[in-house]
């Protein structure tokens, strides 16, 4: 039986990117295509398993594109799909809000 999707747009968005790591993965991919190791290095404290699971979820949701190259050693690259890129203004708003909040805390 298929689970019913939420009707609230905020709930839908939070379901897709509400996880701490997902929003940070999107932040990093907004600067361009990255390999798994590059993402892992830039995300302090994330385990390999958690990064793998988040990337798989984001690929399944249509936010991230995974491209595997038939090379030795194997190479896999991740990039944002159009739906992922559409989150750029959301992250920009978060940056502005975070900067304003930081200033208020001084």
Where are the language model's segments positioned?
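Amphipathic alpha-helical dimerization/coiled-coil segments
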Residues: 5, 9, 86-106
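N-terminal helix-turn-helix DNA-binding core of bacterial DNA-binding proteins
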Residues: 8-50, 74-77
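Residues within the DNA-recognition helix of helix-turn-helix
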Residues: 54
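Conserved catalytic-core motifs of GNAT/GCN5-like acyltransferases
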Residues: 67
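Basic, amphipathic "hinge/linker" alpha-helix immediately C-terminal to the N-terminal HTH DNA-binding motif
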Residues: 70-93
């Amino acid at each position: 039986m298929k689970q019913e999707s939420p009707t609230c747009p905020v709930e839908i968005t939070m379901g897709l990117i509400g996880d701490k790591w997902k929003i940070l993965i999107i932040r990093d991919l907004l600067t361009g295509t990255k390999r798994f190791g590059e993402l892992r290095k830039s995300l302090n404290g994330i385990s390999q398993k958690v990064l793998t699971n988040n990337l798989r979820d984001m690929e399944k949701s249509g936010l991230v594109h995974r491209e595997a190259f038939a090379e030795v050693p194997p190479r896999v690259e991740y990039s944002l799909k159009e739906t992922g890129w559409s989150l750029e203004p959301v992250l920009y708003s978060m940056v502005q809000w975070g900067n304003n909040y930081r200033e208020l805390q001084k």
